[in-house]
């Protein structure tokens, strides 16, 4: 039986998301492979992706009340993971995502979704971690919103 990690890699290859060759990453680093998460384009794909992330979440015993999906690619990942956790594993967590700029009308604020509160444990859901730029951008926003404990 394949592990969730093996099934995830197989899924990425089958969907032409994981590519092999000589690539220059956004960070400027060279790599023998590239993950093009923009190739996930269907409900079936994003549902499967959410399940792989949910399995990883559970395998690593992540203790979080809320999943944060940094704009933009992290948004569907946080939503799909929250759905998979609730539907397939009986684990109900909130989700939210940051805006690129603070909204000063309507509901306002920097985040959409589950409200972050002091003492909350949150997990940041990202598609690919290379340079950590997305984390460096979203962490100050999170800390400004509430004093939370963050896992990535």
Residue ranges of predicted features:
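PRPP-associated nucleotide enzymes
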Residues: 1-126, 130-152
């Amino acid at each position: 039986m394949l592990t969730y990690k093996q099934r995830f890699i197989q899924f990425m290859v089958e969907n032409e998301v994981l590519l092999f060759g000589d690539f220059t990453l956004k960070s400027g680093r060279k790599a023998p492979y590239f993950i093009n998460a923009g190739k996930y384009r269907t409900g079936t794909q994003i549902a499967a992706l959410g399940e792989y992330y949910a399995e990883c979440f559970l395998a690593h015993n992540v203790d979080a009340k809320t999943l944060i999906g940094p704009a933009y690619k992290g948004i569907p990942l946080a939503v799909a993971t929250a759905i998979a956790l609730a539907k397939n594993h009986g684990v109900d967590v909130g989700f939210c995502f940051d805006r690129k700029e603070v909204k000063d009308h309507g509901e306002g604020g920097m985040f959409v979704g589950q409200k972050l509160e002091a003492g909350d444990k949150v997990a940041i859901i990202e598609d690919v971690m290379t340079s950590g730029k997305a984390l460096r951008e979203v962490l100050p926003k999170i800390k400004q919103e509430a004093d939370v404990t963050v896992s990535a």
